[in-house]
Curated annotation (Swiss-Prot):
InterPro entries: Euk_RNA-bind_prot, Nucleotide-bd_a/b_plait_sf, RBD_domain_sf, RBM4_RRM1, RBM4_RRM2, RRM_dom, Znf_CCHC. Residues 2-72, 78-148 form the RRM domain. This is RNA-binding protein 4. SMART domains: RRM (SM00360), ZnF_C2HC (SM00343). It is found in: Nucleus; Nucleus, Nucleolus; Nucleus speckle; Cytoplasm. The gene is Rbm4. Induction: Accumulates according to a circadian rhythm in the SCN. The keyword Phosphoprotein applies. One of its GO terms (biological process) is circadian regulation of translation. A zinc finger (CCHC-type) spans 160-177. One of its GO terms (molecular function) is mRNA 3'-UTR binding. Keywords: Activator, Cytoplasm, Differentiation, Isopeptide bond, Metal-binding, mRNA processing, mRNA splicing, Nucleus, Phosphoprotein, Repeat, RNA-binding, RNA-mediated gene silencing, Ubl conjugation, Zinc, Zinc-finger. Interacts with TNPO3; the interaction mediates nuclear import of the protein and is disrupted by nuclear Ran bound to GTP. Interacts with EIF4G1 and WT1. Interacts with EIF4A1; the interaction is modulated under stress-induced conditions. Interacts with AGO1. Interacts with AGO2; the interaction occurs under both cell proliferation and differentiation conditions and in an RNA- and phosphorylation-independent manner. Interacts with DDX5; the interaction occurs in an RNA-independent manner. Expressed in the suprachiasmatic nucleus (SCN). Expressed in myocytes; expression gradually increases during muscle cell differentiation (at protein level). Expressed in the suprachiasmatic nucleus (SCN).
């Protein structure tokens, strides 16, 4: 028994129509239609080959159908990781090396490592035992089970065979059959099945009368606001506010006794840079007197009154020096003693010799 795949079936096709079409080349054991594709089981292999040769691209209800041998789902394989591969190694050489231990489904080299899909798990175990840590083209390669979860099934490794349709010469990602087994070019059937595409919205952006009316009203409102808030109106309002503020401030000032100053303040042509010196007041006179006293005291304390640097001349007594009319209260002896102290040389005096004399005064 040979299983055939029929793709791109029209919606009008029925199982009886497909069965009668394939019975022209041999006995049909089973016929199933699933949406726009189906499967036909023919008893004889030769009859299946004749049906493929004659019915492939056969036009049925105006649609070309595809007839080919059905490919079973890929069996679970064992994926091996091969590391430290020589840069001169090719896929064919690596495949031949692993085929010594069993059938190889796919061999893919990525830079200095590769992935090899073995058909049977026991063959993969034997390949690991025989090839791990062995020399291959001048480098010691490492073979172990792959732990990668990406693309665990074979396919898309090279163009030697597509795991979707089984044909050679194209990548699996370029296969016309999608992952569900359907032919990828089904645009017409898709439109017929799910309905035509909705016509685009043809009304232009400016066709809405409501939009135009609304925009015009907003434009008119903007123009009115702009005219009301012109520069001249704003300047006039500012000048009026300033005049009111100046009048209110002047009315709150106290009455000025000086008529000349009052007339100057109330005049309209005020000069902010016009400054006049104020007449001297009582406080200013007091300050001038204090300055004169300070100058007199400075000249008084600046005179030299040291007895050691006194100029030569007649020595005045205490009574004569004070001149306050108290000569009778001071004795002549005390005056003579004090004068004798001033006449002594500095180096002849002792520090504590005349303490009794100082205590008498």
């Amino acid at each position: 028994m040979v299983k055939l795949f029929i793709g791109n079936l029209p919606r009008e096709a029925t199982e009886q129509e497909i069965r009668s079409l394939f019975e022209q080349y041999g006995k049909v054991l089973e016929c199933d239609i699933i949406k726009n594709y189906g499967f036909v089981h023919i008893e004889d292999k030769t009859a299946a080959e004749d049906a493929i040769r004659n019915l492939h691209h056969y036009k049925l209800h105006g649609v070309n159908i595809n007839v080919e041998a059905s490919k079973n789902k890929s069996k679970a394989s064992t994926k091996l990781h091969v590391g430290n591969i020589s840069p001169t190694c090719t896929n064919q050489e690596l495949r031949a090396k692993f085929e010594e231990y069993g059938p190889v489904i796919e061999c893919d080299i990525v830079k200095d490592y590769a992935f090899v899909h073995m058909e049977r798990a026991e063959d993969a175990v034997e390949a690991i035992r025989g090839l791990d840590n062995t020399e291959f083209q001048g480098k010691r390669m490492h073979v172990q089970l792959s732990t990668s979860r990406l693309r665990t099934a074979p396919g898309m490794g090279d163009q030697s065979g597509c795991y979707r349709c089984g044909k050679e010469g194209h990548w699996s990602k370029e296969c016309p059959i999608d992952r569900s087994g359907r032919v990828a070019d089904l645009t017409e059937q898709y439109n017929e099945q799910y309905g035509a595409v909705r016509t685009p919205y043809t009304m232009s952006y400016g066709d809405s009368l409501y939009y135009n009316n609304t925009y015009g009203a907003l434009d008119a409102y903007y123009k009115r606001c702009r005219a009301a808030r012109s520069y001249e109106a704003v300047a006039a309002a500012a000048a009026s506010a300033y005049s009111n503020y100046a009048e209110q401030t002047l009315s709150q000032l106290p009455q000025v006794q000086n008529t000349a100053m009052a007339s100057h303040l109330t005049s309209t042509s005020l000069d902010p840079y016009n400054r006049h010196l104020l007449p001297p007041s009582g406080a200013a006179a007091a300050a001038a007197a204090a300055a004169a006293c300070t100058a007199a005291s400075t000249s008084y304390y600046g005179r030299d009154r040291s007895p050691l640097r006194r100029a030569t001349g007649p020595v005045l007594t205490v009574g004569e020096g004070y001149g306050y009319g108290h000569d009778s209260e001071l004795s002549q002896a005390s005056a003579a003693a004090r004068n004798s102290l001033y006449d002594m040389a500095r180096y002849e005096r002792e520090q504590y010799a005349d303490r009794a004399r100082y205590s008498a005064f």
